Amino acid sequence: MTPAVKPGRPALALVLLTLGLFASTPAGAQQYAAPLYRGSAPGSESWTFPVVTRERNGGVSRYNTREPKVAVYLPPASKATGAAVVMLPGGGLRVLGLGAETDEAMARFNGEGIAVVLLEYRTLQLSPEEIDRASAPRPANAPPPRFAKLEIHNANANPAPGDRRLDEVLRFAVADAQETLRLTRSHAAEWHIDPHRVGMIGTSAGGGVAFGTMLAGQPGATPDFIISIFGPALQDVTVPSNAPPLFLVTESNHGPVTDGLVALFAMWKDHDLPAELHAYEVPNFSMRVSLWGSRLFDWMREQKILRPVPAKK
């Protein structure tokens, strides 16, 4: 699915924030933040619902993002490896899940010398009543959610195929991700980044945005590698000629999510392309970086995305 969205005017210069506006900034990171576009994001100028942020138990849920923004977390220059990731939060394209787990992951990436560009991409616009329903806490005795059976074709694990509103939001989110890749590469020298080692990490629907960005195939706006944390493709996949290496992580019982990522892995292997898949027997939505991070960073070294760790004498 190629985004039917014309590129907007990117925010050409990011603003250095020195006043501690993000209290949870990883220690030692330099932080920049700015709107992704100058003026309104192209295509969604008519959106009017206000942004709503809800916090609970260290998690942050942000609804009605209509003006995407980026925040950049850089490791110290002396530790920078040249690798960078655009981080795409999850939330079913309806909300962005941020907070403690996101901060933990960014700190871990910075600790490995990897720059992180956190993108808050556009999401479905919800009324106040819809947000109240979506953000209501689950009863303590509620059974775990059951996932409807979904036939996976061409690795497409979209649970709501044909939903026009979600299809539109996915196009907008992909356009935002493309613009973020362009922005990141344009600042490569300043941020000590190799423009040929800029990948994406997407959680849940964020993984779908990453795969959509890959499939759009825009020059200068495709990821050099993709890390997906229980985030399958949300559209039919054809393996591109310049297919990036994949690192896929999921729970073993996450229904169509697991099935979709298994299908993606099989497609890459059928083409003798680098891909690694880990399916953990853990509760759904419990995939913290402490579970998969060590193996991921070893894989990044094996793929020459990161420098190898010097051997101990």
Show where each model-derived region lies.
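N-terminal cap/lid segment of alpha/beta-hydrolase-fold proteins
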Residues: 30-79
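Short beta-strand element of the alpha/beta-hydrolase
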Residues: 81-90
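Active-site glycine-rich loops that stabilize anionic/oxyanionic intermediates
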Residues: 89-94, 252
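Short amphipathic alpha-helix adjacent to the substrate-entry channel of hydrolases
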Residues: 99-117
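Alpha/beta-hydrolase active-site loop
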Residues: 132-188
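Primarily recognizes the serine-hydrolase "nucleophile elbow" in alpha/beta-hydrolase
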Residues: 171-243
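The feature captures the conserved acid-bearing segment of alpha/beta-hydrolase catalytic domains
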Residues: 224-279
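C-terminal catalytic histidine-bearing segment of alpha/beta-hydrolase fold enzymes
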Residues: 262-265, 269-313
